Curated annotation (Swiss-Prot):
Protein name according to UniProt: Putative uncharacterized protein CWH36
Additional information: Almost completely overlaps VMA9.
Positions of the UniProt region annotated as Disordered: 1-28
Biased composition (Polar residues): 17-28
Species lineage: Eukaryota, Fungi, Dikarya, Ascomycota, Saccharomycotina
Length: 130
């Protein structure tokens, strides 16, 4: 990050400080509601569109892997996602089981402790008397 600052000079600063020589008026167009800044630089928009497409594709693939009969193309892709989902489910189940086991063990330990305390309370005086 430091290297980039040295290399780029004023451009690396916060956008508000270098706005006058970073953006020309036609680059940023403000819409009527004054909320949305639309950047007309084509590269950025293309990148955003690409990211959104990727996200949608991932979501669709995940959905398709739950309904395999609707998924016609890209079987390898589908199998991969399905396997990863199955793996995640298995991890979730095993984690749930492990937690349950630990809870049961804790309950059992407290139960044993209670029993020993009660037995000491009841049996202790008898031994002391004898």
């Amino acid at each position: 990050m430091e290297l980039a600052k040295e290399r780029n000079g004023p451009h690396q600063k916060h956008h508000g400080q270098c706005q006058n020589h970073c953006t020309s008026p036609n680059t940023v167009r403000q819409n009527k509601t004054n909320k949305l800044l639309l950047v007309k630089k084509k590269g950025k928009l293309v990148i955003w569109r690409h990211i959104v497409k990727k996200m949608l594709h991932i979501r669709l693939v995940v959905l398709w892997s739950h309904y395999p009969e609707q998924h016609g193309h890209g079987t390898n892709h589908y199998e991969y996602t399905n396997n990863s989902i199955a793996k995640l489910d298995a991890q979730r189940v095993s984690r749930r089981r492990r937690k349950k086991r630990e809870a049961e063990r804790r309950d059992y330990d407290t139960y044993k402790l209670l029993i020993t305390l009660c037995s000491l309370l009841f049996v202790g005086p008898l031994f002391l008397k004898v």
